[in-house]
Every structure is written in structure tokens, then in C-alpha cells.
């Protein structure tokens, strides 16, 4: 029974039963940092509970907390306190992630409530005790392993080809179900489950890196379209981490060594520069290069830095984009290839010379030379093998040629290329652009009055697949690095532009026309006859049948030069770099692609430090 105190006046006063608040030694430090009294008390309460030490939170986290009003800060700290921090390595970054999630919910007008039910911690703990792996949790992902225990694997970090992408994962599924499944295929290096901070559930996809390529391939065979739960089938395919950047606007006089030195000054982790020279002048490059970095993380950081506009190389802010990653075809498929890719050909080399040089090793089906490279089709693989062994590195018309087996076509890549090309047509449909010095012959097209060529090398479409897919070993001259870049410098591509007015009554059919580049021999100079900037051809007259034409810059329109129009019924895709909607499951994804855009605000300085380094690049059907 509670006792009562009687004062000198004889009146009774209730006893103060509230216990004294215990503060940590860092409480005053929090007040001195500018936190409101109640916020400082709440954070200090977390300190006293032993969930977090003051040394675990850096200045950025405290400063970010000060930006909230008192109610918001208290709600954030309560959510932080209620979170399971047992597997969180960087608690300061985790707190910033909680703050970011809170703001996102506020913007969406949704109630800031507790996250949905997460993983069963008892099962997760049992898994970790059984395997000996570690688990690192951030607001954007859950990373299991990396590296694994020495008892499992003690070798070097796995190389390209050991990672798989797992899509269409049920949102409430976690490591306790994924790990036992995939470890049957082989030893796991790490498993990264992408998380949605707003819901506390996974995003529907994960990346699993195995210790060997064989294990990764086995996982694809075993679990692609595997029913992981009743009615729920996951999709699995080999994933390729991208560590290569495309950089344009490179001075043509620069060498590989100069480019490597210059970009190493402004970025870290640069390991190689892939540079190509002009076919007619080996002393000059083609105005672009590819930068290869140690891994995807360093490449992503370099890309953000180079795209910031603050970094200039040789006084220029260059064009920077992702290059397509290297993808290795199935060894079983490559073992059947009978086509050789020959590069570094001299200008004097003709198809007849190539046929004479290679026919001695076996019967040829076809020889096709395009620019400074060629494809040699053998009737039998043995002949191709002999030719590569004998001719690789040999001198042919003054140049040492390089030979590899051409990589087979990839249908999904072909479909993505078609989408990118159609998008490119729309992007430049109304854009005046003066053509580069070289102009390819007209290529067959479609559309009223004939469509001008896409600007590909002659007869390219017959070799589209091999040409595109081959280049990954030699870093590709164009195909694998996205068509929009083929408008650079010396590239043989027709400029996109409108032609001049056609004469009334005899004009080509409606559609933006093709015109010769200015200043070319045999064509009208700019300002000469028929060179006025044109618009649509006048109506009237007989419509021309479908024919050939080349896209040009400003110039005369008329005669038998075909018109150009937008692709019928084609809607502008999301981006020029990677269209992902309406793709089938079999598309090979790029793992670890950085979050889009250069705006990293609201992340409290943690975006570039291994936080949420991955995104879903695959559309809703993957989730």
C-alpha cells in the first residue's frame, strides 16, 4: 500500500512515484548537437537499451535527424528502435535509410506505420548457425555471405559467369527458403535479396553468386521455372555484372595510353581502355572509347562522377553511358560455330583476297567484308579451326589480322536492338544533323516513297546477329554498344534530317526525305540549288513506289530519293539504353545496374557507399 506524506499544515500530499530518467554519457552531446530535448531523450533511450552505441552514428545521421520536425524524428527513431538490428553492419546508414523511407511515405500520403511482416528471425538464425555464413541487412537489400566461410570456399572471388538472376520471387519469401534451394546446385558465394523499404518485403528478385560457373549453370537448369510455392514459379538465368562504360567526344589524336592516364586521374579502379582506330588512318582513333573497371561498383561510381558535369577531360564534358556487358555464349553452342570473325583488315583487302586466303583450309560457304572486318563462313568446323590456327596474327596486305569464332545470334538481343533503333528513329525524326564524312550506300527500307537506310554498314542486316554478338570479346565496334553511338565522328551513318521541298505535282510521297550530306562531291553544296531546308513534300502527283534512299542533312529533295517517316504504330520506349517492358522471361539481365538518374538527393550521403546499389531493370513480369 502506498504511503502518503503529511506536510506541516496537516494536509496530505501524494508521493512522487515516477522513477528518475537514466541518461547515457552521450545525452549532453546530443543536446549540444542541436537535437530537440525529446528527440535527444528518445535517441539516448536507444543508447541506454544497448541497441546502438553513440559511436555507431556519424555526423551525417545526426544532421539528417535534425531536419525532421519533432514528431517526425520521434516516429523515425521509434521505427529504428523496433527494427531488427542484429544483422545490420552499418547502423548509421540504416538509420538514414529509415529516414528516407519515412519521407517517401509522407510524399505518397500513406500512413507511416510499422513495416509488413518480415522474415522469421528464428529461422534466419537457425540458417546462419547451420551454414556459418553472415547476413548484412540494409534498407535496400539483404546480403547473405560474400565471402563464404573458409570451410565452404577459400578461393578467389568468382569471376564473370558465376552469378544468376532470380526473378518472380514471392514478396514474403526470404533467405530461409532461398538458400536451402540454391545451395543444392553448388557452394554459394553470396545471395543478395533486393528489399522494398516501404513495405519491408522483397522486391521480387535476387542475385545469387556461386563459387563456380558450373554451379551457376546447374542452378539455371534446375530452377528456371521452378515452383517454389504453390502456383508460384521463379525464373532463373545467368546474370552479367556490367563494369564497362562507353565514352564519346574523345580527341581523335589521343592514344590508348593517354586516355588511360587521363581518366585514371578522375576515376578510380580503371583497368583497361578499349580503343579503335580509323580504318584509313591508324594514327587516329574513332572519337570514342570503352573504359573497363575493376567491378560494377567502381564503374557505377565513375559513371556518376563523369556524368556530373563537374569533371572535364581535355577540357570537355564527354558523353558517358553504360556499355553492354560481356556475355559468354553456351560452350556447347560455341563448339558448333563454323563462322570466323576477322578484324583489323587493311583497306586493300577484298572479299576475293579473303576467299583466296581462307579457302585453302576448307570449303567456304560465304565471305563477307564489312569496313575493316569480315565474316568467313566455312562448310565444316574443322576448316574454320585450321584457318584460325594458321591465319590468326598473320600479315595480310600489310596488317596483322585477328581471328576468333563469331558468336551466334541472340534473339532477345536482336529484339532489343530493333526497339532501340525504332526509338532512335523517333528521337531524331525532327532533328537537323549534318552527316559525317563517309556515307554508306543506300539501304533497303520501307515506308511511303521508300525509307532511307538506318545508317548501318552495307548489307549489315544479313550479319546483324553475328556482328552484334561477336564484338563482346573484342569489345565490339558498334553493335553491342547501342546504336545511338554510331553517329559519332567517323562513323558511317546517314544523318537524319528533312529534305527540301519536292516540286508540286511531281513530288515523292509524303514523308521526311533523305538528302545528301553537305559538301560531298557530286552533290549540291549547302545554299546551292535545291538545298533549302525542306519540309514535307507537296501533295499531288503520282506516289512513288517503295525504293531506296539515304538519310542526309539539309539538301534538295525530289527525284528518286525516298521519303522517311516514323515507324508505324510504334510508341516511344522508356529509355534508349535498355527497354525492358514487353520482353519475355528469357532476356539476360544486367546485374547490379545502378539506380537511374544522377539525382542522389535524399539519401544522406550514403547512395554512393554501397547502399541500394541495385535496381529492378526488368518490368513487372519479373516480380
Curated annotation (Swiss-Prot):
Residues 504-522 have a biased composition (Low complexity). Ubiquitous. Detected in heart, brain, spleen, lung, liver, skeletal muscle, adipocytes, kidney and testis. The modification Asymmetric dimethylarginine is found at residues 444, 510, 518, 526, 536, 539. Keywords: Acetylation, Cytoplasm, Endoplasmic reticulum, Isopeptide bond, Methylation, Microsome, mRNA processing, mRNA splicing, Nucleus, Phosphoprotein, Repeat, Ribonucleoprotein, RNA-binding, Spliceosome, Ubl conjugation. Sequence repeats lie at residues 448-450, 451-453, 460-464, 469-472, 478-480, 485-488, 498-500, 526-528, 539-541, 554-556, 557-559. Its main location: nucleus. The modification Phosphotyrosine is found at residue 373. The modification Phosphoserine is found at residues 159, 587. GO terms for biological process: chromosomal 5-methylcytosine DNA demethylation pathway; CRD-mediated mRNA stabilization; mRNA modification; mRNA processing; negative regulation of nuclear-transcribed mRNA catabolic process, deadenylation-dependent decay; negative regulation of nuclear-transcribed mRNA catabolic process, nonsense-mediated decay; positive regulation of cytoplasmic translation; RNA splicing. Residues 460-488 are annotated as: 3 X 4 AA repeats of Y-Y-G-Y. InterPro entries: hnRNP_Q_AcD, HnRNP_R/Q_splicing_fac, hnRNPQ_RRM1, hnRNPQ_RRM2, Nucleotide-bd_a/b_plait_sf, RBD_domain_sf, RRM_dom. Identified in the spliceosome C complex. Component of the coding region determinant (CRD)-mediated complex, composed of DHX9, HNRNPU, IGF2BP1, SYNCRIP and YBX1. Identified in a mRNP complex, at least composed of DHX9, DDX3X, ELAVL1, HNRNPU, IGF2BP1, ILF3, PABPC1, PCBP2, PTBP2, STAU1, STAU2, SYNCRIP and YBX1. This is Heterogeneous nuclear ribonucleoprotein Q. It comes from Mus musculus (Mouse).
Amino acid at each position: 500500500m502506498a504511503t502518503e506524506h503529511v506536510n506541516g499544515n496537516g494536509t496530505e500530499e501524494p508521493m512522487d512515484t515516477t522513477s528518475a530518467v537514466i541518461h547515457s554519457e552521450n545525452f549532453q552531446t546530443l543536446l549540444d548537437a542541436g537535437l530537440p530535448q525529446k528527440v535527444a531523450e528518445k535517441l539516448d533511450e536507444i543508447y541506454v537499451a544497448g541497441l546502438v552505441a553513440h559511436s555507431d552514428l556519424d555526423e551525417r545521421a545526426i544532421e539528417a535527424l535534425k531536419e525532421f520536425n519533432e514528431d517526425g524524428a520521434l516516429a523515425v527513431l521509434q521505427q529504428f528502435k523496433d527494427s531488427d538490428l542484429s544483422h545490420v553492419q552499418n547502423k548509421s546508414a540504416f538509420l538514414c535509410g529509415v529516414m528516407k523511407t519515412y519521407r517517401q511515405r509522407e510524399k505518397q500520403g500513406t500512413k507511416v506505420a510499422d513495416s509488413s511482416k518480415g522474415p522469421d528471425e528464428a529461422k534466419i538464425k537457425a540458417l546462419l548457425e547451420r551454414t556459418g555464413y553472415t547476413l548484412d541487412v540494409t534498407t535496400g537489400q539483404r546480403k547473405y555471405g560474400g565471402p563464404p566461410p573458409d570451410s565452404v570456399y577459400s578461393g578467389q572471388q568468382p569471376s564473370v559467369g558465376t552469378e544468376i538472376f532470380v526473378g518472380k520471387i514471392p514478396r514474403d519469401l526470404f533467405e530461409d527458403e532461398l538458400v536451402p534451394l540454391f545451395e543444392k546446385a553448388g557452394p554459394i558465394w553470396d545471395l543478395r535479396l533486393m528489399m522494398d523499404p516501404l513495405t519491408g518485403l522483397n522486391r521480387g528478385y535476387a542475385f545469387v553468386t556461386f563459387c563456380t560457373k558450373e554451379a551457376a549453370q546447374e542452378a539455371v537448369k534446375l530452377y528456371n521455372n521452378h515452383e517454389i510455392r504453390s502456383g508460384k514459379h521463379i525464373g532463373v538465368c545467368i546474370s552479367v555484372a556490367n563494369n564497362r562504360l562507353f565514352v564519346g567526344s574523345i580527341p581523335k589524336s589521343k592514344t590508348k595510353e593517354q586516355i588511360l592516364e587521363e581518366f585514371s586521374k578522375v576515376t578510380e579502379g580503371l583497368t583497361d581502355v578499349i580503343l579503335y582506330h580509323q580504318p584509313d588512318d591508324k594514327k587516329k582513333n574513332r572519337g570514342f572509347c570503352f573504359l573497363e573497371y575493376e567491378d560494377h561498383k567502381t564503374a557505377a561510381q565513375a559513371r556518376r562522377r563523369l556524368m556530373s558535369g563537374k569533371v572535364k577531360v581535355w577540357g570537355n564534358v564527354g558523353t558517358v553511358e553504360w556499355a553492354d556487358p560481356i556475355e559468354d555464349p553456351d560452350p556447347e553452342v560455341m563448339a558448333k560455330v563454323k563462322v570466323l570473325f576477322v578484324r583489323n583488315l587493311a583497306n586493300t583487302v577484298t572479299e576475293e583476297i579473303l576467299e583466296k586466303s581462307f579457302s585453302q583450309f576448307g570449303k567456304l560457304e560465304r565471305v563477307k567484308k564489312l569496313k575493316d572486318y569480315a565474316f568467313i563462313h566455312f562448310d565444316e568446323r574443322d576448316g574454320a579451326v585450321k584457318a584460325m590456327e594458321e591465319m590468326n596474327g598473320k600479315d595480310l596486305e600489310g596488317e596483322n589480322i585477328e581471328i576468333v569464332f563469331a558468336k551466334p545470334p541472340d534473339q532477345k538481343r536482336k529484339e532489343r536492338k530493333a526497339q532501340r533503333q525504332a526509338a532512335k528513329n523517333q528521337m531524331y525524326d525532327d532533328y537537323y544533323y549534318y552527316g559525317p564524312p563517309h556515307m554508306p550506300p543506300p539501304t533497303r527500307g520501307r515506308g511511303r516513297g521508300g525509307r532511307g537506310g538506318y545508317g548501318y554498314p552495307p548489307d549489315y542486316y544479313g550479319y546483324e546477329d553475328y556482328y552484334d554478338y561477336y564484338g563482346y570479346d573484342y569489345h565490339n565496334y558498334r553493335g553491342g554498344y547501342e546504336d545511338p553511338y554510331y553517329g559519332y565522328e567517323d562513323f558511317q551513318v546517314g544523318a537524319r534530317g528533312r529534305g527540301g521541298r519536292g516540286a508540286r505535282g511531281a513530288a515523292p510521297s509524303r514523308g521526311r526525305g533523305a538528302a545528301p550530306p553537305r559538301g560531298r562531291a557530286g552533290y549540291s553544296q549547302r545554299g546551292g540549288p535545291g538545298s533549302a531546308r525542306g519540309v514535307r513534300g507537296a501533295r499531288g502527283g503520282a506516289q512513288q513506289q517503295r525504293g531506296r534512299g539515304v538519310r542526309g542533312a539539309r539538301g534538295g529533295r525530289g527525284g528518286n530519293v525516298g521519303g522517311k517517316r516514323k515507324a508505324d504504330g510504334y510508341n516511344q520506349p522508356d529509355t534508349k539504353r535498355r527497354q525492358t517492358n514487353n520482353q519475355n522471361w528469357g532476356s539476360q539481365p544486367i546485374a547490379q545496374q545502378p539506380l537511374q538518374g544522377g539525382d542522389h538527393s535524399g539519401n544522406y550521403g550514403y547512395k554512393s557507399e554501397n547502399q541500394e546499389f541495385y535496381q529492378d531493370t526488368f518490368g513487372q513480369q519479373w516480380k
